[in-house]
From Swiss-Prot:
Tagged with keyword Membrane: yes
Superkingdom of this protein's organism: Viruses
Pfam families reported for this sequence: GP120
Keyword Calcium part of the UniProt annotation: no
Compartments in which it is found: Virion membrane
Signal peptide: 1-31
Native species: Human immunodeficiency virus type 1 group M subtype U (isolate Z3)
Region (V1): 130-148
Protein name from the UniProt record: Truncated surface protein
Gene Ontology terms describing biological process: clathrin-dependent endocytosis of virus by host cell; fusion of virus membrane with host endosome membrane; virion attachment to host cell
V3: annotated span: 293-325
InterPro entries for this protein: Gp120_core_sf (IPR036377), HIV1_Gp120 (IPR000777)
Length: 460
């Protein structure tokens, strides 16, 4: 989408031009010529303007998107209008889009405002004495990913401290000295303490996205490309104008795109430069794939409260839960991956398409990262991105085959200390959530990278 501004070459005639334009649109509505008048007089040009947001946010909700949108956005239009521009061709470039940049800035603002009143956890940047808690052969719990740590915290009396014990995920701590036997107590620190200020997310605050509409101010309109096979750059011959976009959920995830919009026809491949393997490939699916994720609860209390001085509480992990995981129907996923391979093969001159898991990097890149019910999941997707397509699929699946009616289970790990992707030097501590957590999403797209050789694609 692009924002266009009406060019004001004759400022003293502007009021009259609006009145005349309105009259022409009313009087000529049944004729075809009015489109030319609307689009050509006055002249439209590219413009950089600040859009405003609209939403159906509920003031009584404590969810962060609702809180932010209640103050930052206007109510959404119950009957939005769209005007098709006949015989109009416009150039679009989704990779250089001011509206997308503004959306990013708004999400940064949302997270910043959500964390401002919350407790800074500078006291956690101390030496942690930790020992593994794995003492059983039960693989259905998260014991192997947990360490039990003791450290000193401030009390109500400024000159006194006390020692407390709590559980941390191993992904959240870094050893200061490595020992050969992992069961022996060792010293650690929190993973982001050397680079970031850590803020604890306020209790009873969640991050479940709601649809946000972006709207053009008076004198501007948003141009929308309606070509069903548009690849993101170049001319678009099916153009319309809208005052506001459709509702966009600001979902933050990696590798798999969740709860987005679908292609109306075939799978669409988009890249700023498909021949440059450093550029991300965005795949828009034409059918959703359901992904169901669970973190089982526990009989024991999962969250414990630790006082860290006057009026401040640190919500620590106090119990072990079941192993977090996600399920995807095998047959649905294989059929989807086949359609993606066919679309990719058209881009790469019918070369064989080989799917592999991520080739390395930060955990946010090597796993499918997303928020599920307030916990941050990091799921291993190596079972998803595997297979070769060279005109035939080496892993054919239909719903009637016995080995494809089951689920692909993705083991997931959880982090509580999360780097806020929108800012440098900032990290968030997500307090543990009590009870069983479940979330169900629709996979509507993929993020892929291509290696430097053939048609080999890695998840990103």
């Amino acid at each position: 989408m692009r924002v266009k501004e009406i060019q004001r070459n004759y400022q003293h005639l502007w009021k009259w031009s609006l009145i005349i334009l309105g009259m022409i649109m009313i009087c000529k509505a049944i004729e075809k010529s009015w489109v030319t008048v609307y689009y050509g007089v006055p002249v439209w040009k590219d413009a950089e303007t600040t859009l405003f947001c609209a939403s159906d946010a509920k003031a009584y909700e404590k969810e962060s998107h609702n809180v932010w949108a209640t103050h930052a956005c206007v109510p959404s239009d119950p009957s939005p209008q769209e005007l098709v521009l006949g015989n109009v061709t416009e150039n679009f470039n989704m990779w250089k889009n001011k509206m997308v940049e503004q959306m990013h800035e708004d999400i940064i603002s949302l997270w910043d405002q959500s964390l401002k009143p919350c407790v800074k956890l500078t006291f956690l940047c101390v030496t942690l004495n930790c020992i593994d808690v794995k003492n059983s052969t039960n693989n259905n719990t998260e014991e192997a990913t947990i360490t039990n740590c003791s450290f000193k915290v401030p009390t109500e009396l400024k000159d006194k401290t006390e020692t407390v014990h709590t559980l941390f995920y191993k992904l959240d701590v870094v050893p200061l000295n490595v020992t050969n036997n992992s069961s022996i107590s060792s010293t650690y620190r929190l993973i982001n303490c050397n680079t970031s200020t850590i803020t604890q997310a306020c209790p009873k605050v969640s991050f479940e996205p709601i649809p946000i509409h972006y709207c053009a101010p008076a004198g501007f309109a948003i141009l929308k490309c309606n070509d069903k096979k548009f690849n993101g750059t170049g001319p678009c011959k099916n153009v319309s104008t809208v005052q506001c976009t459709h509702g966009i959920r600001p979902v933050v995830s990696t590798q798999l795109l969740l709860n987005g919009s679908l292609s109306e026809e075939e799978v669409i491949i988009r890249s700023e430069n498909i021949t440059n393997n450093a550029k991300t490939i965005i795949v828009q699916l034409n059918e959703t794939v359901k992904i169901n994720c669970t973190r089982p609860g526990s009989d024991k209390k999962i969250r414990q409260s630790i006082r860290i001085g006057p009026g401040k509480v640190f919500y620590a992990k106090g119990g072990i839960t079941g192993q977090a995981h996600c399920n995807i129907t095998d047959g649905e996923w294989r059929n989807t991956l086949q359609q993606v391979a066919i679309a990719l093969r058209r881009q790469f001159n019918n070369k064989s398409i080989i799917f592999n898991s991520s080739s390395g990097g930060d955990i946010e890149i090597t796993t499918h990262t997303f928020n599920c019910g307030g916990e941050f999941f990091y799921c291993n997707t190596s079972e998803l991105f595997t297979g070769i397509w060279n005109g035939t699929w080496d892993k054919n699946c239909t719903s009637t085959e016995s080995n494809c009616t089951g689920n692909i289970t993705l083991p997931c790990r959880i982090k509580q200390v999360v780097r806020t992707w929108q800012g440098v030097g900032q990290a968030m501590y997500a307090p543990p959530i009590e009870g069983t957590i479940r979330c169900s999403s629709n996979i509507t797209g993929l993020l892929l990278t291509r290696d430097g050789g053939n048609g080999k694609c890695n998840s990103k």
